Amino acid sequence: MIRIFNQKGKLYEGPIWAYNSLYFVDIPKGELHNLKEDGTHWAVKFPTYVSSLQPTKRGGIIVTAGNGFYLVKDKDQISLLYEVKDWDSRNRFNDGKCDQMGRYWIGTMNLEEKYPTGGLFVLDLDMKFRRVLTDVTISNGLAWSLDNKYLYYIDSPTRKIFKFKFDLERGDISQREVLIDLKEYEGVPDGMTIDSEGNLWVALYGGGAVLRIDVEKRKVIQELRLPAPRVTSVIFGGSNMDTLFITTANDHPDGGFVYSERVDVKGVETYYCGF
């Protein structure tokens, strides 16, 4: 396990690999970071918290900050794409990803992390914002099966990974079931990604680990230990897509850094947003 970014953050989250770079955010600091393979780094600061980011087909990065979606073309060119008007002040945005059609799926979480006031939402290609799931406390990791027939989803306090049937054309989910219960592991599931074999990689917040889960056998088949207990998210990247980039939170001398680990499987490319 290698520490690749030595600037200590408060809550690094939401890593993506796009444009041959690693992007990630520091949620409470309102920072978007870009780290290239040669170590070159730049950052953009927003006046409010940021939570997720995704690349877009027209170039640049879409960032969820406050109650809006922003397009970052470069560090000096930022514009508001969409603002959620009827915002529930009990919540904030959390993890989000785009599906293969380019829709932006974004979850919300209860600010007190206690009550099921959050949900899962979709910003469609026609810029309509809709709710697809209610009664969520801390909406977190999202990943689609390789055939796009299923959505895997985390509501962290449940300590479970859920599986939904996914309709790619309509952008709808149905038939929720529990894929796996992780209650025997320390911590709660947080961010999540999928590899080229269709298995999930899940960050354990408070558990100091990333778990690899076989979705067919519904069991953990690998565990990567980290020096920091609060592991927040994970993504594949690098020139061969076989490097796992892992973000952590600052509650420990080794927390609040970004780590990497070469693994024996490749990831899949991040879907790009369609707006």
UniProtKB/Swiss-Prot annotation:
Lineage: superkingdom: Archaea
Protein name: Uncharacterized protein Saci_1674
GO molecular function, one term: gluconolactonase activity
InterPro entries per UniProt: 6-blade_b-propeller_TolB-like, SGL, SMP-30
A GO biological-process term: L-ascorbic acid biosynthetic process
Pfam families: SGL
Organism, scientific name: Sulfolobus acidocaldarius (strain ATCC 33909 / DSM 639 / JCM 8929 / NBRC 15157 / NCIMB 11770)
SUPFAM superfamilies the UniProt entry points to: Calcium-dependent phosphotriesterase
